Amino acid sequence: MAARGGAERAAGAGDGRRGQRRHLRPGRVLAALRGPAAPGAGGARAALAAALLWATWALLLAAPAAGRPATTPPAPPPEEAASPAPPASPSPPGPDGDDAASPDNSTDVRAALRLAQAAGENSRFFVCPPPSGATVVRLAPARPCPEYGLGRNYTEGIGVIYKENIAPYTFKAYIYKNVIVTTTWAGSTYAAITNQYTDRVPVGMGEITDLVDKKWRCLSKAEYLRSGRKVVAFDRDDDPWEAPLKPARLSAPGVRGWHTTDDVYTALGSAGLYRTGTSVNCIVEEVEARSVYPYDSFALSTGDIIYMSPFYGLREGAHREHTSYSPERFQQIEGYYKRDMATGRRLKEPVSRNFLRTQHVTVAWDWVPKRKNVCSLAKWREADEMLRDESRGNFRFTARSLSATFVSDSHTFALQNVPLSDCVIEEAEAAVERVYRERYNGTHVLSGSLETYLARGGFVVAFRPMLSNELAKLYLQELARSNGTLEGLFAAAAPKPGPRRARRAAPSAPGGPGAANGPAGDGDAGGRVTTVSSAEFAALQFTYDHIQDHVNTMFSRLATSWCLLQNKERALWAEAAKLNPSAAASAALDRRAAARMLGDAMAVTYCHELGEGRVFIENSMRAPGGVCYSRPPVSFAFGNESEPVEGQLGEDNELLPGRELVEPCTANHKRYFRFGADYVYYENYAYVRRVPLAELEVISTFVDLNLTVLEDREFLPLEVYTRAELADTGLLDYSEIQRRNQLHELRFYDIDRVVKTDGNMAIMRGLANFFQGLGAVGQAVGTVVLGAAGAALSTVSGIASFIANPFGALATGLLVLAGLVAAFLAYRYISRLRSNPMKALYPITTRALKDDARGATAPGEEEEEFDAAKLEQAREMIKYMSLVSAVERQEHKAKKSNKGGPLLATRLTQLALRRRAPPEYQQLPMADVGGA
């Protein structure tokens, strides 16, 4: 029976160990494993040193044995061979040089040697029965190596990438005029400005169309409304006239303006009086206007915000655009010829001109259609070489010129759902045609129509596929054979549109770009595409796809090369099986087996692990007959009760049942054999010691290969800060401040209401116009009449104003009360005067006369008789005295006023004489005269 490993029963002198042939050189194998320092791999110097070393050891070992005859070691007795214990080893010489030793020492040495030569508890040994041919195997033939593909359908084409258009719509607008009112106070030797304010007022639309754009002139008068009343201002407080417009002193790029005057009029009055002067400067300024989506208002570069869409008009459905003003404030003129502001000449091309008059400014701009001038998407990049491939149900558009990859769904995107997106198809088709003419006109043909896809991050990819001329010829040949059409071929390969809806914009802050929607006629009811502010994720996606493609291609090539290498190694395995079939079978089957070749097939038997058997290694490798064992002899048993079996230690702890592996004995014999978990060392075919694994250096033939295929990863856009957060980082929001300030009057006041004046002013204005039409004389007469009427109106207005004042009303009430009291007192006085004039006129005199009369009459005397004549005379005297008093008062008043005095006295005298009865004179007695 052939032993495992290929060792023969009787080897020749030149044979080596088991499994070794003349053409196998261990030095070269070790040199390949360990490098130049391995044994057998050195040069001539290393070989000479090794030869000298072996010669020295041979002389040292041959010297003691030179005096002894060469004897053959006796064969072991049969009874010892049956014992499971190893044969006795020669005892070491005693101290006196004899070979004998004491019985106790011999017993201890034998016990120690027996323990050292026994296998450990964790040792594993295998017993392999000889292959009988019951199981026959063969090597598998070479395999065909597959060519790995990435599994993607690439389509070459031209792409145009669009993003969200966040740029505002800009256009030119024109605004008008300034009014400056200055109040001064004049002193004796100086003048001071006590107040000055500037007000911006609008210009009438008729003045703009008839004067500014026709004659390049402007009136020096301004009419406007303030606090519900109409105000008229004149430049330099003079009559209005048509002033020419002249360029402004300071001009800058994009900022142009024209005006009528440079002076600010300041009026100076008399000393100690205030005087107000007015300046009207007609300013025509060209400004830049900006409007953002949804275009419901626009802002001027002056800070004014107009709450009307710049596309508001009266035709083509533009009246549905947003406006916050009454229709009377807006006017649109078709076929309007405007004037060039730089040269002052009238332009030849007519335009549609919009005019809007607000409270402080008149704005004019050219009306244009909305859909043709604004677009919610803007062209970002053109990719003249774009590849579209399908991966995991998605499309990937790779633009190497941009180093970016965009991922989208496999369905096309309907741009009809995006408001104001008509520009995308037109611009993209024009860009694709231009790129094709410049680069691919002679090498490729366009296939199919323009397709649009919504990529992640809010990018719209317009892709036009194309084919190379060679591939197009193949398609045409295929169509000729199948009688098909080119449209049908491309339609079968093109992606089918699906129910794709536009991605709606993220909720924004109130008043933000996405807070309002425009009219339904422009498609604003659909969703607007919102693009992220950074495209780094597309660059990362391109980088990852590039690395993934490169690594997967490398792995596929490595797998193919591995397959080819396995096919080539199959031939080596076939040859190795002929040299050592058991080792080849064990390596191929991945378990311990014994095998032998049966021609081109192999007989295999599986080895069995020795359970709890005991294995002992013997201390000598010398065999009877002058030969030596090539493998150490062992004895093993299955369990405690089984008979021991003599055998040899095979390779890798294999137990061979017989002892048939022998070789000629050689000098300087040194061998290491694997025994259980350790190694045993033999020198000159005698057991020396057990060698742990740590004392032997390990050389490995394994090459580690740890490969992991990269998984598919898609980078998603991540916004760290939203637009609302970025806009809210500043301390103040200037646009919001302006919006709130200018919305104040619109929110809380009615700027369109006009307070009507009274009829007196209308009458005065009519009289003034009447007298002005009569010439110079009429104007002079009108001035006098209007002055008098104005004085009367002023007096009445002053009285009304005084009464309207709370203090004036109180004073008026007190005056009325005082008048009533005075009237009551006057009424009492008149009543007393009528009843007793003498007492009323001369109360003191009458009282004194009465007292004298009472005192003159003595008590007890009789009163004299009453004289009726005297009483009548007294009455006449009192009457004339009152008349004289009245005449004197009238004359005094007449003298004081220097008119009407004598006339009034004469009339009173005549009146008194007319009513006087003819006098009856009686001559008085002389006694009375003398007594007087």
From Swiss-Prot:
Residues 1-12 have a biased composition (Low complexity). It is a single-pass type I membrane protein. Its main location: virion. Residues 184-190, 269-276 are annotated as: Involved in fusion and/or binding to host membrane. The keyword Signal applies. A motif (Internalization motif) lies at residues 921-924. GO terms for biological process: symbiont entry into host cell; virion attachment to host cell. Residues 828-932 are intravirion. Residues 511-526 have a biased composition (Gly residues). GO terms for cellular component: host cell endosome membrane; host cell Golgi membrane; host cell plasma membrane; membrane; viral envelope; virion membrane. Residues 751-804, 784-804 are annotated as: Hydrophobic membrane proximal region. It comes from the Viruses. Keywords: Disulfide bond, Glycoprotein, Host cell membrane, Host endosome, Host Golgi apparatus, Host membrane, Host-virus interaction, Membrane, Signal, Transmembrane, Transmembrane helix, Viral attachment to host cell, Viral envelope protein, Virion, Virus entry into host cell. A motif (Golgi targeting) lies at residues 880-883. The chain crosses the membrane at residues 807-827. Residues 63-806 are virion surface. Belongs to the herpesviridae glycoprotein B family. Envelope glycoprotein that forms spikes at the surface of virion envelope. Essential for the initial attachment to heparan sulfate moieties of the host cell surface proteoglycans. Involved in fusion of viral and cellular membranes leading to virus entry into the host cell. Following initial binding to its host receptors, membrane fusion is mediated by the fusion machinery composed at least of gB and the heterodimer gH/gL. May be involved in the fusion between the virion envelope and the outer nuclear membrane during virion egress. Homotrimer; disulfide-linked. Binds to heparan sulfate proteoglycans. Interacts with gH/gL heterodimer. This is Envelope glycoprotein B. It comes from Bovine herpesvirus 1.1 (strain Cooper).
